[in-house]
Amino acid sequence: MKKWWFNSMLSKKELEHGCGLSKSMDSLGPIENTSTKEDPSLNDPEKQIHSSRNSESSSYSNVNHLVRGIDIQNFISDDTFLLIDTKGDSYSIYFDIENQIFEIDNDHSFLSKLQSSFSNYWNSSYLNSRSKNGDTYNGHSLYYTNDSWNNHINNCIDSYLHSQIRSDSSILSGNDSYILSYIFNESGNRSESFSKRSITNGSNLTRRESSHNLDVTQKYRHLWVQCESCYALNYKKLLKSKMGICEQCGYHLKISSSDRIELLIDPGTWNPMDDDMVSMDPIGFHSEEEAYKDRIDSYQIKTGLTEAVQTGIGQLNGIPVAIGVMDFQFMGGSMGSVVGEKITRLIEYASNKFIPLIIVCASGGARMQEGSLSLMQMAKISSVLYDYQSNKKLFYVSILTSPTTGGVTASFGMLGDIIIAEPNAYIAFAGKRVIEQTLNKTVPEGSQAAEFLFHKGLFDPIVPRNLLKGVLSELFELHAFFPLNQNKGED
């Protein structure tokens, strides 16, 4: 493994020039290799680092000598880049493309020091002279605030990494990868340690943080939940009282089936059904990584559930209801034979008792470890729903949460008399990655979101989580299902 030394004071133009980025740094095209001959100073580390350590003035010549004279593909094959400021503080980036590793040693003092150095350099007479000659970066503004400086650093690394990764498509394949880490210090103030967006042809690139950051992240993990949309951190103890809704942007985070039951069902009225029913690996599914039975056991320990759905009877504002709630935390909410059987028995019970039915969907689809048996659950549940709705003339409400995909979407998820979706829920039959890999077509962004599908007529209302219980209560009363105490008062 090699180690390279960079002077830290780089303008965007110089990084483009020194690294051979002939295109805009904001574009995501491949880096073009330069044809400059190798400089002898590349083989002499002392020559590479003298200007950054022995001079307080800015210098970029080492970067030009370093990068332009070597093959850019091999440049980050297995190298550690050590960026140092004028005071000698270091900041290292380790690349190993072959083993798909990108490791950053985060130094909290680095960005602030680098920002100060960059500001001085940006206003230097050399850069001003280049501006007078018209040598500016695509006419972009030369004024940088604190936020734009962070964005500038992130964009430079984004473009550079993306170009390198795309040049070797045999290594990576898959979807976009978004990585963002937040660290909390002892006083509880948030500091964004580093942010980057790696848009690649693959999702297998991993980022390893320094051991210090991992320790801090693990230390505060039990206190905070990060929003999937705005990346804000929500205090975990308060998040439950807010029904799992991000207080910064209003995004509906995933919540457990138990939390959802607590949200919808009146306290003290929940009576679970068939909670002792477990899968017995009906087809003897073989896996080299982990046996199916062992995987079931591990998820049971992790979630405290026996399967990916909870079913039972309860009251919603005094109205008796049969409710099934799927839990995405248990094997992605996948539908196996036990899940199908529990939902089938719930529907049959609701038919016999003439009570309304609610099923909250959160699933990746049929469970592959049970083969055709899991697929048959689609037909079994649909047939018993036909009897419940068409013959008994009873009322079924389907609630689609994020994500609802595959066999659940193709069966009982879309069979409700009223189909309700949560805001920004991901609802689809085939996932985006599957469609793109199968048809070689790009799926438009947001085309599988609830708001887009609502305008296509796929379901009825989009109801925020905090209003859901009231909406369901009004729907039931509209269909002549009234609270028990109200019926007794009328008698």
Curated annotation (Swiss-Prot):
Its main location: plastid. A zinc finger (C4-type) spans 227-249. It catalyses: N(6)-carboxybiotinyl-L-lysyl-[protein] + acetyl-CoA = N(6)-biotinyl-L-lysyl-[protein] + malonyl-CoA. GO terms for cellular component: acetyl-CoA carboxylase complex; chloroplast stroma. Pathway: Lipid metabolism; malonyl-CoA biosynthesis; malonyl-CoA from acetyl-CoA: step 1/1. Residues 223-491 form the CoA carboxyltransferase N-terminal domain. Residues 35-49 have a biased composition (Basic and acidic residues). Acetyl-CoA carboxylase is a heterohexamer composed of biotin carboxyl carrier protein, biotin carboxylase and 2 subunits each of ACCase subunit alpha and ACCase plastid-coded subunit beta (accD). PANTHER family: ACETYL-COENZYME A CARBOXYLASE CARBOXYL TRANSFERASE SUBUNIT BETA, CHLOROPLASTIC. This is Acetyl-coenzyme A carboxylase carboxyl transferase subunit beta, chloroplastic. The lineage of its organism: Eukaryota, Viridiplantae, Streptophyta, Embryophyta, Tracheophyta. The gene is accD.
